[in-house]
Amino acid sequence: MHSDITPIHTHKKYWAECFGTAPFLPTSRKEMDALGWDSCDIVLVTGDAYVDHPSFGMAIIGRLLEAQGFRVGIIAQPQWQDKTDFMSLGKPNLFFGVTSGNMDSMINRYTSDRKLRHDDAYTPNNEGGKRPDRATLVYSQRCREAYKDVPIVLGGIEASLRRVAHYDYWSDKVRRSVLLDAKADILLFGNAERALVEVAHRLAEGEEIAQMTNIRGTAVNLAAEPEGYTIIDSSRIEKPRKEAFIPPNPYEVETQCETKSEEPKAQPITIRPSRHDAATTAVRLPSFEKLQNDRILYAHASRILHLETNPYSGRALIQRHGNRELWVNQAPIPLTTEEMDYVFGLPYARVPHPKYGKAKIPAYDMIKTSVNIMRGCFGGCSFCSITEHEGRIIQNRSQESILTELEEIRDKVPGFTGTISDLGGPTANMYRLGCSDPKAEANCRRPSCVFPGICNKLNTDHKHTIDLYRAARQVKGVKKVMIASGVRYDLAIESPEYVKELVTHHVGGYLKIAPEHTEKGPLDLMMKPGMGTYDRFKEMFDKYSQEAGKKQYLIPYFISAHPGTTDEDMLNLALWLKKNNYECDQVQNFYPSPMCNATSMYYSETNPLKRVKYKQREDVPVAKGDRQRRLHKALLRYHDPANWPLIREALITMGKKYLIGDKPGCLVPAEDVDARTPAQRRKSGRHGANRFATKHTSTQPGFPGDKANAGSGKKPTRGGQSNSAPSRSGSATGGKHPQRSGANTGGKSSGGKNSPRAGGRNQPSRAR
């Protein structure tokens, strides 16, 4: 399939390869002089500190371009108030590569309540304020001021998820594509190594960047529609233009793939290819101007966008912005295993740049002994952008490449103790899983391979993952291999052998999984499995933990205020937590990040997962007001006395006054309990048995297994990574993982970072 694609490691190298490999990519003129360079071919500008590690975007992109023969310099966290820092490496011969960093700068700087954060895990000493709001725009402006005639290439998570007109939570309005606002020359979206290498070589050959309009995984700003394309008009919901040819609408088909939960009599999947060649067809989205004032049309546009993400059958998109046309090419072809091995096998130093001295960079400390084994996610959770950024098709590394990296960690990472903190990716257990039918995979438009049930064509055999775990444990010098990426438990229960292997050898006391909610309404809109699946996994987890002679615990993640969640839903979740003796130390309030389906629900109050019409649509209840969002968060922390007055008021309003009091079935005590001291409340049994944190600190508070594990020599490990950990998969000029919409940490901590992962988070890695 697509045999005409040139592997990224087979391009003819640029002449400057004669300079060899730099110990670190230069960040100053002095370092350039030491390498014998008179100039840089490419200068990368990033909002993160420069850590030469494959979990950091600039390192992957910089080392990849260096391997192609280019001289690459890095300007990390420049002073953006003027152009001085942007001229520190001189004028690049080819282009500036600009990214906000591993995270969207707005998510990095603000909480879900739009409060300014005072820390930054990607900055030395966790110092906040080292990058501007909308860093991609600001950096692009300064690059243009520094050298007006140098092309600007945008990439990373911020640019990728803002490539079309999008709802912006912080300004509460629809904004233009970041490409037009930044006035850059081209935007690369997703894990764009393939596109970036092509752009670099074509520029090196003397081609004008304005001529590069047909590269997969890119978006460009055009004056008019390109010639040679059939344009399908989806700019309206019910009244398309009469002059446009309207083929049978592929978005009207509501049939689902056969799932494993269905009866055997279910009909098999029927492949119905489009009557148009995807390579010469484009879909017109509603214009930016229309989306500004029409929320229902925005939901329609979001639906179309998400249905065109398949790299094999998805079509180009075109969207009017004033008198300009935004042209978004087809999604990039996924990297092969050989290409993935090439990217992760580049000569990374695996430590921060020496200029930072002894300063601690929290994001690096979190992932310095972890290994990314794959990219992509076919979970399709509506609050997560991984599919839109990394793709639904899993891109795997070979076992040999992964084991080699384990040996590099052993040999290169200072202070390595023998523990590998994670083998994972967006999820822990999608390694080498995927569609068993290439034809179906090439034409499928399902947003998820596992919802509402696991597709019969999905290979769920975890054999390769089990073999990898066993091989990793045999690497000399490796004493323990932990799995910190979130486990997709609906997949795991399809392979009991995997669950046994995981629980027996790779859980350090706690394992984080993400049911996200207990109620069917929110779960369906999240595209998450029901609690019955969670219960089955918990039974297996407890069974195998007991067989292994270990006391281990599941830590469930939940989201408050997700679109589709009513006060009644959150109350039922709180009652479930109390019934199961769970007390969330910190909670997650839904965070509408760009391009997520859930963000479209939040803005439009309409379900974009189904066909959208003005008079025929599914409306979605949304918690938008500050008070209701506080209430939903408070219900997740029902045990916190500070939340009791708000919960009491809500219970009375809902006609649930019987849940106030000291009876076993009550959620919060009567008002007279407020005057008691914390010690008195603990003595009265107001606190549940299982108190847990959803954002890890250096210790895990209050879980009953701590003493048992300590006594047996088994240290509880991070069952999931901190919300401030970096993501771990490559994308053009940085930004390694899409952030989750629902990943803001709340509770007592106001400074918790949003994860770029789904898991992981990543986007920390959190299974979605």
Swiss-Prot record:
InterPro entries named in the record: Elp3/MiaA/NifB-like_rSAM, Methylthiotransferase_CS, rSAM, rSAM_horseshoe, UPF0313, UPF0313_C, UPF0313_N
Family label: Belongs to the UPF0313 family.
Biased composition (Polar residues): 719-731
UniProt region (Disordered), positions on chain: 674-768
Co-factor remark: Binds 1 [4Fe-4S] cluster. The cluster is coordinated with 3 cysteines and an exchangeable S-adenosyl-L-methionine.
Composition-biased stretches (Basic residues): 679-689
Record-listed [4Fe-4S] cluster binding positions: 377, 381, 384
Domain Radical SAM core: 363-640
Cofactor dependence: [4Fe-4S] cluster
UniProt keyword Metal-binding present: yes
Name the UniProt record assigns to this protein: UPF0313 protein VV2143
Higher taxonomy: Bacteria, Pseudomonadati, Pseudomonadota, Gammaproteobacteria, Vibrionales
Domain of life: Bacteria
PROSITE patterns linked to this entry: RADICAL_SAM
Molecular function via GO: 4 iron, 4 sulfur cluster binding; catalytic activity; iron ion binding
Regions annotated as coiled coil: none
A Pfam entry, by short name: DUF3362
Record keywords, A-Z: 4Fe-4S, Iron, Iron-sulfur, Metal-binding, S-adenosyl-L-methionine
Signal peptide range in chain numbering: none
